[in-house]
Curated annotation (Swiss-Prot):
Pathway: Cofactor biosynthesis; riboflavin biosynthesis; riboflavin from 2-hydroxy-3-oxobutyl phosphate and 5-amino-6-(D-ribitylamino)uracil: step 1/2. It comes from the Bacteria. Catalyzes the formation of 6,7-dimethyl-8-ribityllumazine by condensation of 5-amino-6-(D-ribitylamino)uracil with 3,4-dihydroxy-2-butanone 4-phosphate. This is the penultimate step in the biosynthesis of riboflavin. InterPro entries: LS (IPR034964), LS/RS (IPR002180), LS/RS_sf (IPR036467). The gene is ribH. It is an enzyme of class 2 (transferase). The keyword Acyltransferase does not apply. Forms an icosahedral capsid composed of 60 subunits, arranged as a dodecamer of pentamers. (2S)-2-hydroxy-3-oxobutyl phosphate binds at E78, T79, R120. Its EC number is 2.5.1.78. This is 6,7-dimethyl-8-ribityllumazine synthase. 5-amino-6-(D-ribitylamino)uracil binds at F15, A49, V50, E51, A73, V74, I75, F106.
Amino acid sequence: MTESSFKLAIVVSQFNRAVTEKLLNGVLQRLTELDVQANQIKTVWVPGAVEIPLLAKRLAKSKHYQAIVCLGAVIRGETDHYNYVCQQVSFGCQQVALEYEVPIIFGVLTTTTKEQAFARAGGERGNKGADWADAAVSMIKLMKEIEITDE
């Protein structure tokens, strides 16, 4: 994509950083392949996955970004915490998208094991970050095509 008329933000969880850094690299590499320039991208780190929706909301509310890619890795443990985190993050991201009409790309891996997460962050299953970059650019284009004017 050669037009530079859009900006996008990436919100990345620091928790499970070994995985999320790889996802971020996948997003950034794919955006570079799509001719998206560094000055069109803002990357923000949050402590954990639960904090992603709040920062996504703040970025969406600013109206500076045409899409927001949310990256995290929630890996099942021995307690029910995994279920609560997954539900809160997915619901929160969806609420932001619907409230602000900004594409929120849900790039949060929810896996049973670390091995599954690494497999999807540049391992044998590829890097899902590249897919999420494609989704962000596609949604930016679609939202421009289907703009609604207030009359």
